[in-house]
Swiss-Prot record:
The keyword Transport does not apply. Its main location: cytoplasm. Gene3D superfamilies: Glucose-6-phosphate isomerase like protein, domain 1, Glutamine Phosphoribosylpyrophosphate, subunit 1, domain 1. It comes from the Bacteria. GO terms for molecular function: carbohydrate derivative binding; glutamine-fructose-6-phosphate transaminase (isomerizing) activity. Keywords: Aminotransferase, Cytoplasm, Glutamine amidotransferase, Repeat, Transferase. Pfam families: GATase_6 (PF13522), SIS (PF01380). It catalyses: D-fructose 6-phosphate + L-glutamine = D-glucosamine 6-phosphate + L-glutamate. GO terms for cellular component: cytosol. One of its GO terms (biological process) is UDP-N-acetylglucosamine metabolic process. It comes from Chlorobaculum tepidum (strain ATCC 49652 / DSM 12025 / NBRC 103806 / TLS). InterPro entries: GATase_2_dom (IPR017932), GFAT (IPR005855), GFAT_N (IPR047084), GlmS/AgaS_SIS (IPR035466), GlmS/FrlB_SIS (IPR035490), Ntn_hydrolases_N (IPR029055), SIS_dom (IPR001347), SIS_dom_sf (IPR046348). This is Glutamine--fructose-6-phosphate aminotransferase [isomerizing].
Length: 614
C-alpha cells in the first residue's frame, strides 16, 4: 500500500530519495517523509503530496547536505489519520533510530500498552511507531546486539505483515531491512545500494536486483549486502536482471492497472482479513465498530446506501446480514435515498459504502441519515477521507490504492468486510459458534480459490474473443449471485462500451427474453447451490431461443457443458462466499473484451474514479 525507498552509497541521499518517492507516487499515498544520516539523524515529513515534501526540503534541506545514507516513504494510512505526525519515518525518543514500515502490525495495541507502561512516549497514532520503540528498548537492554540483532529480536515479538527499513546514527554505515508479507527489493549498484518496495524507483539506477523472501532480513552497507532469515541463517540470493520499462514496473508487469488489481485480489483479501478473522476462535475482531457492536445488534433495521459497484456489494451485504444476523436490511442508491423522503429513525443503522470516502451522493445520504437520528457507520478504503470523519464508527477495507477506474479489488474487499460484519452481528444471537467457525473457515479459504480461478486467465481470454463484437449482453444470476450478475454487466458496460444488463434469472421471462436471439450472449452464473435446478431451466429457455450461453459453474459440473457454448469453472464453495469467486471470471471477461476492442480499460470514457459531484 505504501512506498519505500532507501539509499546507501557515496552520492547525496536526499535528491535520490525524493526522486524515488516521485517514482512511487503511482501507488497512491497521503503523506511522505525521509530521514538521512550526516553525523546525526535528520528528518522531514509532510502530509499531502511529494511536492509538499519537496518544498519543505527546498526550504530546510541544507541540514541534509552531505548525507549519503537515508530512507524515505510514502504512506497510505491504515492506523491514524493522514497527518504530518503520522507520516513516516518514525523515530525513537532519543532521535538516533529511524524506521519506515509497510504493512499492519496486528498486535500493536498490546505492544504499545507495554511500552507506554515502561515510559515510552508515542508521537503518532500509527502501529508502525511501536516497532521503532521496541527496537530501541531491546538495543538499550543489550547493546552488544547491535542494530541488526535488535531488529531481529523485535520482529520476533511482532504479529502481522511488514516491510521495514531501519537506520541509526549509532551505526551510520548500514541499513537493516526485513520483510514478511510486504515486498522489498535491493538494487545493486557500483559502491551503492538501493532498497525499495518495488523496482520502480530503482530501475533508472541499476537493473540488477535481489528480491527478499518472506521471513528474510538484510544488512546493506556501501560495499556489500548480507541476507539472513529472521532466525539468523544466512541465505544465498539470486541476482535478477530487470528488462522492464518504468511504466511496466509500476503496473507490476501487467499491461494495465485493472489487470494488476484483479490479480492482486488474493493478497488483498488476506489483508482485509488479517488480524480480524479468528477462525479457530469462531469470531471476528472489528476494532472500528467494537465499542458500538451491542448497539448495532439492537438495530430494528439496517439501511445500506452506496453507488455503482459499492451498491452491488451492499446488495450482497443485505443477503449476508439477513441470512445470518436476521436483521432486516434495505439497500438504497445513495442518489435516490435523499430525494424520496425516507422513513429513518434512531432505531435504524445506516451503513454507507464508498471506496474513496468522498462520493458526493453517498455523503449526502450520510448527512440526511444523521439529521434523522440514525446511527451511521461507514465502509471505506481511504483513511482520513470524509466518510470515516463524519460517521460514528466503521471499517476500512485495506484494499490499497485502486488506480483503475472500474473497481475490482475494492468490490471484493467490501464484500469481505460485510461478511465479517454479518458474523459479528450474528455472534451470540442467531447462529452457533460452530457455524460461525465454519463460515470463517470458508472465508479464509477464498484467497486460494481466487488464485485458482486466476490461473484460467488465458482460457477466459479465448472466450472473450467470441464476445468482442457483441452489441448487447445479458447477465443472469440468482440468490447471492444476482448482485454479481449486476456487477458483471456493469463492468462490461464501463470498459468495453457494450450495452449489458444484469437480471435475476427468473425475471428473464418478464421482459428480457424478448431480446434473446443468436446474436445475444447470455452469461449465466450457474453454481451448485439451492437455485441450481432453477438456473438450468433458465438456461434451457435461453437455448430454445438460440441464445449463446456462457456459464460460470462449479468445478466438476459436467451436466452444464451440454447446455452451454462455454463454461468457466470455479471451486466449490458455500453460497455465502460464492460472490467472491463468481465475480472474478466476470472481471477478467470484461477486461479481455475491452482490450480486444481497443478500449482504454484504466481510463474509460466519461467516467471518473471518485464521483465527487451530485
Amino acid at each position: 500500500m505504501c512506498g519505500i525507498i532507501g539509499y546507501i552509497g557515496r552520492r547525496e541521499a536526499a535528491p535520490l530519495l525524493l526522486n524515488g518517492l516521485k517514482r512511487l507516487e503511482y501507488r497512491g499515498y497521503d503523506s511522505a517523509g525521509m530521514a538521512v544520516l550526516n553525523g546525526s539523524m535528520k528528518m522531514l515529513k509532510k502530509k499531502g503530496s511529494v511536492s509538499n515534501l519537496e518544498e519543505l526540503l527546498n526550504v530546510s534541506g541544507t541540514v541534509m547536505l552531505g548525507a549519503t545514507v537515508g530512507i524515505a516513504h510514502t504512506r497510505w494510512a491504515t492506523h491514524g489519520d493522514p497527518s504530518d505526525r503520522n507520516a513516516h519515518p518514525h523515530m525513537n525518543v532519543s532521535g538516533d533510530i529511524a524506521l519506515i514500515h509497510n504493512g499492519i502490525i496486528e498486535n500493536y495495541s498490546a505492544l504499545k500498552q507495554e511500552l507506554m507502561g515502561e515510559g515510552y512516549v508515542f508521537e503518532s497514532d500509527t502501529d508502525s511507531e511501536v516497532l521503532v520503540h521496541l527496537i530501541d528498548r531491546i538495543w538499550k537492554n543489550d547493546s552488544a546486539l547491535g542494530l541488526e540483532g535488535a531488529v531481529r529480536q523485535a520482529l520476533r515479538h511482532v504479529e502481522g505483515a511488514y516491510g521495514i527499513c531501519v537506520v541509526s546514527s549509532r551505526e551510520p554505515d548500514k541499513i537493516v531491512v526485513a520483510r514478511k508479507g510486504s515486498p522489498l527489493v535491493i538494487g545493486l549498484g557500483d559502491g551503492e545500494f538501493f532498497i525499495a518496495s518495488d523496482a520502480a524507483p530503482i530501475v533508472e539506477h541499476t537493473n540488477k536486483v535481489v528480491y527478499l523472501s518472506d521471513g528474510e532480513m538484510a544488512v546493506v552497507t556501501r560495499d556489500s549486502y548480507t541476507v539472513k532469515t529472521i532466525e539468523n541463517v544466512e541465505q544465498q540470493k539470486r541476482v535478477t536482471e530487470l528488462d522492464f520499462s518504468l511504466e511496466k514496473i509500476e503496473k507490476g508487469g501487467f499491461e494495465h492497472f485493472m489487470l494488476k488489481e484483479i490479480f492482486e485480489q488474493p493478497e488483498v483479501m488476506r489483508d482485509v482479513m488479517r488480524g480480524r478473522v479468528r477462525v479457530e476462535e469462531g469470531r471476528v475482531h472489528l476494532g472500528g465498530i467494537h465499542d458500538y457492536l451491542d448497539r448495532l445488534k439492537q438495530a430494528k433495521r439496517i439501511m445500506i446506501c452506496a453507488c455503482g459497484t459499492s451498491w452491488h456489494a451492499g446488495l450482497i451485504g443485505e443477503y449476508l446480514i439477513e441470512e445470518f444476523a436476521r436483521i432486516p436490511v434495505e439497500v438504497d442508491y445513495a442518489s435516490e435515498f435523499r430525494y424520496r423522503n425516507p422513513i429513518v429513525s434512531s432505531d435504524d443503522v445506516v451503513i454507507v459504502i464508498s471506496q474513496s470516502g468522498e462520493t458526493a451522493d453517498t455523503l449526502a445520504a450520510l448527512r440526511l441519515a444523521k439529521e434523522k437520528g440514525a446511527m451511521v457507520m461507514g465502509i471505506c478504503n481511504v483513511v482520513g477521507s470524509t466518510i470515516p470523519r463524519e460517521t460514528l464508527c466503521g471499517m476500512y477495507t485495506h484494499a490499497g490504492p485502486e488506480v483503475g477506474v472500474a473497481s475490482t479489488k475494492a468490490f471484493t474487499a467490501q464484500v469481505i468486510v460485510l461478511f465479517m460484519l454479518a458474523m459479528a452481528l450474528s455472534k451470540g444471537r442467531t447462529i452457533s459458534q460452530e457455524e460461525i467457525k465454519l463460515n470463517l473457515r470458508e472465508l479464509a479459504e477464498v484467497p486460494d480459490k481466487v488464485a485458482w480461478i486466476l490461473e484460467q486467465n488465458d482460457a477466459i481470454k479465448e472466450i472473450a474473443v467470441k464476445l468482442k463484437d457483441a452489441r448487447n449482453a445479458l447477465y443472469l444470476g440468482r440468490g447471492y449471485n444476482f448482485p454479481v450478475a449486476l456487477e458483471g454487466a456493469l463492468k462490461l458496460k464501463e470498459i468495453s462500451y457494450i450495452h449489458a444488463e444484469g437480471y435475476p434469472a427468473a425475471e428473464m421471462k418478464h421482459g428480457p427474453i424478448a431480446l434473446i436471439d443468436e446474436d445475444m450472449p447470455v452469461i449465466v452464473i450457474a453454481t451448485r447451490d439451492n437455485t441450481y435446478a432453477k438456473i438450468l431451466s433458465n438456461i434451457e429457455e435461453v437455448r430454445s431461443r438460440k441464445g449463446r450461453v456462457i456459464a460460470i459453474a462449479s468445478e466438476g459440473d459436467r451436466e452444464i457443458e451440454r447446455l452451454t457454448e462455454d463454461v468457466i469453472y470455479i471451486p466449490q464453495a458455500s453460497a455465502a462466499v460464492l460472490p467472491l469467486l463468481t465475480v472474478i471470471p466476470l472481471q477478467l471477461l470484461s477486461y479481455h473484451v475491452a482490450t480486444l476492442r481497443g478500449c482504454n480499460v484504466d481510463r474509460p470514457r466519461n467516467l471518473a474514479k471518485s464521483v465527487t459531484v451530485e
